[in-house]
Regions:
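N-terminal beta1-alpha1-beta2 module of alpha/beta enzyme domains
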Residues: 1-68, 162
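Hydrophobic faces of well-ordered beta-strands that scaffold small-molecule active sites
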Residues: 1-5, 37-39, 69-71, 99-103, ...
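Active-site mouth loops of central-metabolism enzymes
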Residues: 5-20, 74-82, 158-168, 306-316
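Conserved, mostly hydrophobic/aromatic
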Residues: 29, 33, 41, 60, ...
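Acidic (Asp/Glu)-rich catalytic clusters
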Residues: 30-31, 57-65, 88-98, 178-179, ...
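Alpha-helix-loop-beta-strand connector modules within alpha/beta enzyme cores
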Residues: 50-73, 125, 353-366
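Internal, glycine-rich beta/alpha segment that forms the wall or movable "lid"
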Residues: 80-183, 188, 192-200, 213, ...
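An alpha-helical appendage that flanks or caps ligand/catalytic pockets
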Residues: 120-154, 193-216, 244-333, 364-366
Length: 366
């Protein structure tokens, strides 16, 4: 069981303060008994104010000693895969294997213009980028002769054997992950039925590929393949550990969910209904398409109601019941809980501590 930190930019919050608070939340999650913590990545918007999940993961790894830390996700469409592999290798080696790299395709946002990677690579190049990333994480040397990357063989220094997790919100990306034997990161924007269907599709695609495994070492663990938080397909064990997914030979899939505990379910739902729209409305509006297409739209109130009804939001007993229900319906045994929903840092830390004390003991044996 882990925590998922979007570094949410609630109105009035300073971005630097939010980032410092995110690192503190991970340290508190370690004290509370969580297995891992996952950090989101966004550019040029208040939805999430961390532009480099891997960089902040390095800070968090330096502040902790046991907890695994992962990216949910590093956006591969705006990064050179070998550069990201080198950064992941540093974090893996220096942390003693506590880092897990989660990657995603991202969305058709203005990021593609700013970083110069372009819409064509976003639309056609994710598979090539992912294969190059996996090669750099699983070999002493790496080279490329593809549509988007071409370079001579070079040594990978430091070498590392890592298997990334792939954020999946679409059937093609589910198939892509399955064919490579890479675990999926499933977003909190879908319910148990959709997650179960995606896991079934993954198994079918994996069997069709002959069980081929092109990733690195087993285990570990999330944009859509978009962000595991808001999960638009327009477009989180710590490092190297088995994620503990249920079912037959599922390779450590991870599911993101909202996690918020209060004395009563009514109070928990009321607090999130009051707080989350203040963040989600301007945050989701910050997604600016690079090519002038209409931006994403969502009924914010209905979305918050869905999150509260679907995920571990409520009394300790209800939170445990929702976690157990998801495990039974999907086979997922590794959930990462978005704990920032109240928009208040002190409440976030209290939420993490209460989840660790009052909920985790009820679900450890699932």
């Amino acid at each position: 069981m882990g925590v998922f930190l979007i570094a949410a930019g609630f109105p009035g919050r300073d971005a630097g303060e939010v980032l410092r608070d995110t690192v503190e939340a991970i340290a508190v999650a370690e004290e509370a008994g969580f297995d891992d913590a996952w950090i989101a990545e966004h550019h040029f918007m208040s939805y999430g104010v961390c532009p480099s999940a891997a960089t902040l993961a390095g800070v968090a790894l330096g502040r902790t000693s046991r907890i695994g830390v992962g990216t949910a996700v590093s956006v591969l469409s705006t990064r050179h895969p070998v550069d990201l592999a080198e950064q992941a290798a540093i974090l893996d080696r220096v942390s003693g294997g506590r880092f897990t790299l989660g990657v995603g395709r991202g969305g058709p946002w203005v990021d593609l213009e700013v970083f110069g990677t372009g819409l064509e690579r976003f639309e056609r190049g994710f598979g090539e980028s992912l294969d190059l990333l996996c090669a750099a994480l699983d070999a002493g040397t790496v080279s490329a002769e593809g549509e988007f990357f071409r370079f001579r063989p070079v040594p990978v220094v430091p070498p590392a054997r890592l298997r990334p997790v792939v954020a999946c919100t679409s059937a093609p990306t589910v198939a892509l992950a399955a064919e490579r034997g890479l675990p999926m990161l499933l977003g909190m924007h879908i319910g148990d039925a959709e997650r179960a269907a995606m896991i079934r599709s993954y198994r079918t695609a994996s069997e069709g590929a002959g069980g081929e495994r092109r990733g690195g070492r087993d285990g570990g663990l999330g944009n859509g393949d978009g962000d595991p938080g808001e999960g638009r397909d327009v477009g989180p064990g710590g490092g190297g550990r088995d994620g503990g997914a249920g079912g037959d030979a599922d390779p450590g899939h991870v599911g993101a969910a909202v996690g918020y505990v209060a004395d009563t379910t009514e109070r928990a739902v009321r607090e999130l209904r009051e707080a989350m729209p203040r963040w989600l409305a301007p945050g989701l509006a910050g997604h600016v398409p690079v090519d002038g297409r209409p931006g994403p739209r969502r009924d914010i109130g209905a979305y918050v109601d869905f999150l509260c009804d679907t995920h571990p939001v409520g009394s300790p007993g209800r939170c445990a019941e929702r976690i157990a229900r998801t495990a039974g319906a999907t086979g997922l045994r590794h959930l990462i809980l978005m704990v920032e929903g109240a928009g208040d840092h002190a409440r976030t830390l209290d939420n993490i501590r209460r989840l660790g004390e009052q909920v985790l003991p009820l679900v450890r044996d699932l």
